[in-house]
Structures are given as C-alpha cells and as structure tokens.
Curated annotation (Swiss-Prot):
Annotated Zn(2+) binding sites: H435, H499
EC class name: lyase
Signal peptide (from-to): none
Pathway: Cofactor biosynthesis; thiamine diphosphate biosynthesis
Subunit: Homodimer.
Cofactor(s) for this UniProt protein: [4Fe-4S] cluster
GO biological process: thiamine biosynthetic process; thiamine diphosphate biosynthetic process
Cited function: Catalyzes the synthesis of the hydroxymethylpyrimidine phosphate (HMP-P) moiety of thiamine from aminoimidazole ribotide (AIR) in a radical S-adenosyl-L-methionine (SAM)-dependent reaction.
Encoding gene per record: thiC
Domain of life: Bacteria
Protein name: Phosphomethylpyrimidine synthase
Annotated residues for binding of [4Fe-4S] cluster: C579, C582, C587
Residues annotated for substrate binding in this entry: N237, M266, Y295, H331, S351, R352, G353, D392, G393, L394, R395, E431, Y458
Protein family membership: Belongs to the ThiC family.
Organism: Cupriavidus metallidurans (strain ATCC 43123 / DSM 2839 / NBRC 102507 / CH34) (Ralstonia metallidurans)
Length: 625
C-alpha cells in the first residue's frame, strides 16, 4: 500500500487494498476464545534461518499486536460499500438489554436521511440503530461492576497477552523472551502473560482504571482496552476541512492509519458532509472512533459559538451515538471562572473546543452548558455505551503556560465529573497536555492520578520544547515516551505538520510510527510482560546480518529497506555481512563474530588466555589501574 496519491473512488481504494496492504513476511493469525466467534487477530512475523558452518538454524515466528483489522487478512475480500463484518452483533443481541429502534432519533440525522441532495453520499447498507431498553445500562463498566465478564472483556485479555504464555516452554524462544526488569512507577501490571485474564480486565474496567470504548452501534469493532495497566495505546487523527476532501479519501486515511498501528481514530471533520463522512468511516473501521461533537454542533450554527444551545448539542450527541461513535471529547471542565486565568498566558486558549466553550460562556455570562447538563449527557452515554474523553480545553499551548492554575483547575473539575460519570457507570478517560517541559511532566501525571482517581490519561504528546516547527513529532514523541512510562494510557499522535498545516498520508505515517516508538519504549520501561521479544528478535537478526528479517521486524519495513537499498541496492547486499556505514572491513559485529569463531576453535586453556587478552585490550591496555 505504497501509493501516496489520495484515492479517487471507493473502487480504486478497494483495488489498492487487495493488491498492496499485506505486510512483508507476515501472516494473519487468530486466537480463539471460549466461543468460536471470539477470534482475536494478531500478526506473526516470519523469520529466515540463521546460516552457520554446521548448516541452517531456524528462527521462530514473532507474534505482534495488530490493529489492521480484516484489511490485512488475505482471506477477506474488502467491500467498502458493504462495510466490515459485524463481529459484535451477536454478543450485543444475546445480552437482551437493547432494542432496535424503528428509525433515527436525532432530528438532524432524520433530516440528512430524508434530504435528496445527500442521497449519493449515503452509506447504502444502513440498519436501524440500537439503544438500551428503558431503565437499562449497557456500558462495559456497568457489566463489570455487576461481575459479568463480557465477550469484549475476554477478547481484550487475549489481545493484550498475545498468548505469549504458550511460548515460554519452547526452547527456541528462551533467549528471545529475556527481558530487563521494568519500573512500573506504581502501576499494577500483570506479571506474566497468563495473568492477563478476562477477570483482570473486568476488575480494571469496574474500578474505572480502564475503558473498553465499544458503542453498541459499532458492531464492526475489534474490542481493545485503554488503561494504565495495559499496553500503551496511540490515537491517530483524521478529518476533512472546509478545503478537503472526498469520502473515499477519509476512509483511506483511516485504513492507512490502522495499517501503521493506530489503536483508535478521532474524526475531527469540520468541512462538508460531516455526517456522511463519519458513517462511512464507522462502517469500515475495526478500531474505536472518537469525535468532538461540539465541532459539528458549531457547524450547525454556521460557526457562531454564541448561537450554540444545549438542545442542539444534545441532538448531535444522539445523532453520533446512533451512528456508533465510541467516545466523545466533551469540554465540560471549561468553567466560566477559569477563563480569566488564561488572560496572562503566552498563547491563551489553544484548544478549539475549549475556545468555543469559553466564548459561549463569556457571551452569555453563564456556566458552561456541558457542565450544567452533565447528568443528562451521562444518560445518553450509558444508553449506547459511549465513553467520555473529558477534554482539556485549557491545556497549555506552549511550555511557558504549562502547569498553570487554569490547566490544573480544569483537571480537578474533570475529576469531579469523572466521579459523577461513574455514578452512572459510564466509562471515562481524561485528556491531557499539550506543551510541557520534561521536568514538569511528572506533576501532570501525579495530579491526574490523584484528582481523577486513576481514570485512564490520554495526552497529546506532550511537546517538551517549542523551538522545532516541522519536527514536533519528535519534540512530542520525547514527552510521550516519558509520560507513557509514568502512566498515561493512550498517546495522541503529533505529525511533522503540527502548527503548520493539514497532514498528508506521509505525515500521518511519520506521526504514527513516532508514537508507536514512544508507546513501545514506555511498555519496555514499565516492564510489560513479553514487550522485549521483538527487540531481541531484531537485535539477533542484526547481529547475524539477516537483513530481510531486520526490515520485517521493524515498525516500518518499507523505510528500513529503502534506506539500506539507497547505498547497497543489489540483492546480494541482503545477505552481506556489512552495511554501507562501516563497510566490509570495519563492521564491529562482523569482527565480533570472527573473534567468537576464533575463540571457539582454540583448546580450552588457550581460549581462556585469548579471552583475557581481549579483556585487557577492551579495558584500555593498562598494566596498572
């Protein structure tokens, strides 16, 4: 899937997916749960054999977490106009606490459905939405607190563990599964893969330390968890604007993002046909989709924040919930009394949602209607199992503004709202900054854990310096790795175009890979069981000059291969025992292998003297220390 030009149509995108999506040297495999319809996907990276003087030694396949859905399964034909298979439909029906509505409940949704001008844009295979039966609560938190382990929870447990426990008794994995002890900084990670059980997942969701964003109307979803005691996740953003783009382009952006490893997607569309764009994305997305409903509500007013009303916003929530949106960013913590605190900031209020609500509060001199109507919002959320992503509308937009009274005042209000949402058994995560220098990051994590009761933290970076426009995927990736280690559950990616323009596909790829690195570095630091397996496999391949395995085990095989081939394009270079950096005579790994081979050929006594000789040279060739 190397094409960078946007798809002109769904037909051309489907053709591209069928031909180019497959990962190199990989197979799509599934773990089956307690019932045959719990089929958890993972990717298995196949390795070549190690060549020795005694012959070839096989290297085992490496299982990795996979977010690509059916798009990477060669046995599945992708039909974007039909959408993905409804893998959760039966689970939801069996619970018998929802009902299929006779039609849409949202006034705006009905208007769009009945507008002849939008007929050519609509997803054709729509079914009527579901909603909780009267008096029912259908959230994963509600089930967890009742002691019920849902298929979604079992799915998550299998997905997080990758069934790695089955590898520990296999001799070919013994060296590869070695791992440095981590420092979880207070998190209660599973100690071994087998400790990641459905019951573990249930307890974490019941306590509010994790969420499973899974709207009952997003049946195509492959369930995943966001929580401090799970793998660190990343989010990718997409969305049209007033100047871009087609429906096919937006679906392509979603598929492109999950191909590189996005665990969730936020649709931040602000242009034309927001409703129809979101429908196409949801019906074809295997990962949770989040939105910022205030953006669409503002669009309905013609962009005039003062004209927003609770009734209009409520209708937007229902419209999006009935489409299947899994989590909403709600800026309910932007209170009237906090707005003046931003007056002396260098960059003021940088959140779009935060600035919209601040303007509304000042124009009406009233409290934020998202705050005053919060209980009513909770009633909507639990009827569809939409999770809260409580927005940080007052996040700092530069490091000079970090950790100020406005930011932390809002955070404490988000903690108050978290407790209120939990009274309704509604799932919650907390959004965080932003721009924070390294030495001030820990305070953000500490404040969130204390005041938001360990609800999952979801941060945008943070960027640790403001001097690098064009490289803010790096400035933020540094902060993301640190705050991920400290306990942040999900990292929102930043692309090289941050603060400069709308990212294209290559910018999205760059941002996602940067954040996959940050998330993985955090998992290693925390000591996630089995996290070092892929590192060890790649290191072994590097030492043995198995170039193809090095490429394929990496996060971006295409880039690794292209960099290597830029200077050594011949096929023979793929088995050469050197690269273009050192050349054949100065490769440290080749020299080390020669030393090992030489030492192995010596008699034992002589070998010992040879080892001492090498040790003497390595320590500086000094007789006296």
């Amino acid at each position: 899937m190397a094409r960078t030009a946007p798809a002109a149509s769904f037909e051309s995108l489907e053709s591209d997916l069928d031909q180019k999506f497959a990962y190199p040297a990989s197979s799509k495999t599934y773990i089956t749960g307690s019932r045959p319809d719990i089929r958890v996907p993972l990717r298995t990276i196949l390795q070549t054999a190690t060549r020795t003087e005694k012959g070839e030694m096989a290297n085992p396949p490496i299982p990795v977490y996979d977010t690509s859905g059916p798009y990477s399964d060669p046995d599945v034909h992708i039909d974007l106009k039909a959408g993905l298979p409804p893998v959760r439909a039966k689970w939801i029906e069996e619970r018998n606490d929802t009902e299929v509505l006779t039609g849409l409940s949202s006034e705006y949704g009905l208007a769009r459905a009945n507008d002849p001008a939008t007929a050519h844009l609509r997803f054709a295979q729509l079914t009527n939405p579901r909603r909780a039966k009267a008096g029912a609560n259908v959230s994963q938190m509600h089930y967890a607190r009742k002691g019920i382990i849902t298929p979604e929870m079992e799915y998550v447990a299998l997905r997080e563990s990758l069934n790695l426990q089955a590898l520990y008794d296999k001799p070919e994995y013994k060296a590869l599964l070695r791992q440095h002890p981590g420092n979880a900084l207070g998190a209660a990670l599973p100690l071994r893969p087998e400790d990641m059980t459905p019951e573990f997942v249930r307890r974490e969701v019941a306590a509010g330390r994790a969420i499973i964003p899974a709207n009952i109307n997003h049946t195509e979803l492959e369930p995943m968890a966001i929580g401090r005691n799970f793998r660190v996740k990343i989010n990718g953003n997409l969305g049209n604007s007033a100047v871009t783009s087609s429906l096919a382009e937006e679906v392509e952006k979603m598929v492109w993002s999950i191909r590189w490893g996005a665990d969730t997607i936020m649709d931040l569309s602000t242009g034309k046909h927001i409703h129809e764009t979101r429908e196409w994305i949801l019906r074809n997305s295997p990962v949770p989709i989040g939105t910022v409903p205030i953006y669409q509500a503002l669009d309905k007013t013609g962009g005039i924040a003062e004209d927003l009303t609770w009734e209009m916003f409520r209708d937007t929530l229902i419209e999006q919930a009935e489409q299947g949106v899994d989590y909403f960013t709600i800026h309910a913590g932007v209170l009237l009394r906090y707005v003046p605190m931003t007056a002396d900031r260098v960059t003021g209020i940088v959140s779009r949602g935060g600035s919209i609500m601040a303007k509304w509060c000042l124009a009406h001199h009233k409290e934020n209607f998202l705050y005053t109507h919060f209980d009513e919002i909770c009633e909507i959320m639990k009827a569809y199992d939409v999770s809260f992503s409580l927005g940080d509308g007052l996040r700092p937009g530069c490091i000079a503004d970090s950790n100020d009274d406005a930011q932390f005042g809002e955070l404490r209000t988000l903690g108050e709202l978290t407790a209120k949402a939990w009274e309704h058994d509604v799932q919650v995560m907390i959004e965080g900054p932003g721009h924070v220098p390294l030495q001030r990051i820990q305070a953000n994590m500490d404040e969130e854990l204390k005041h938001c009761y360990e609800a999952p933290f979801y941060t945008l970076g943070p960027l640790v310096t403001d001097i690098a426009p064009g490289y803010d995927h790096i400035t933020s990736g540094i902060g993301a790795a640190n705050i991920g280690w400290m306990g942040t559950a999900m990292l929102c990616y930043v692309t090289p175009k941050e603060h400069l323009g709308l990212p294209d596909k290559e910018d999205v790829r760059e941002g996602i890979i940067t954040y996959k690195i940050a998330a993985h570095a955090a998992d290693l630091a925390k000591g996630w069981p089995g996290a070092q397996l892929r590192d060890n496999a790649l290191s072994k391949a590097r030492f043995e000059f198995r170039w193809e395995d090095q490429f394929n085990l990496g996060l971006d095989p295409e880039r690794a291969r292209s960099f290597h081939d830029a200077t050594l394009p011949a096929e023979g270079a793929k088995i050469a025992h050197f690269c273009s950096m050192c050349g054949p005579k100065f490769c440290s790994m080749k020299i080390t292998q020669e030393v090992r081979d030489y030492a192995a050929s010596l008699p034992e006594a002589e070998r010992g003297m040879q080892e001492k000789s090498i040790e003497f040279v390595k320590t500086g060739s000094k007789i006296y220390s």
